[in-house]
Amino acid sequence: HVQQVRLLERDLQTLVPALDEEGLPERLRIALNADSLATWWAEAVGEFCAQQHLLLDLVVEDQTVGLKRMRAGEVAACVCASERPVAGARSVLLGAMRYRALASPAFIARHFPEGVRAELLSRTPALVFGPDDFLQHRYLASLGGDGGFEHHLCPSSEGFIRLTEAGLGWGLVPELQVREQLERGVLVELLPDKPIDVPLYWHHWRNGGQLLGLLTDQLVRSSRQWLVPLA
């Protein structure tokens, strides 16, 4: 894999500086889900990238399918919901992203005039990130639903929230991303006692070199500030 070779070459250049004739910054290609990119990722890696003179080539994939990029050898690492690593890689649990079912007050008044009930959710328009996003399906199944539901597709974390605020549908939104909207009452939680947690794992190549190892240590430490710990 090209990424692995480059990372090992970087380690050699660190030991023998004369080999690093160009002195260019290293670049890592990493796959991660859009919600991580929109919330905790930047703060988790910002200072590290500056210190290590590291450039990132980020590839956005749903957390359920990001591992396919590792399997194809296209990325050096990925953040995804799958625990089992591909051959030649390791995975480490970072924590869980907590999602809450939210809607605008106007949407709730229009679709739930007598109060929100779990069995009614599948009969109202929802918002789904993309064709690989089955989080709403899992959520409805946990409430006893077993069929399809009407939904909009919105492949943007920021746009997802804007559409929810505009009353187009209800959606499962990262708690990290909407604390201000919840405080202001712009968005309201439909079922306050029923969040859904999505575990996030960091996958990286075993022979990824020192830089990837340092980045792994940084993510394990810093992710605790934002993600929900899992037993």
Q: Model-found features: residue ranges?
A:
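Central regulatory/effector-binding core of bacterial HTH transcription factors
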Residues: 17, 23-87
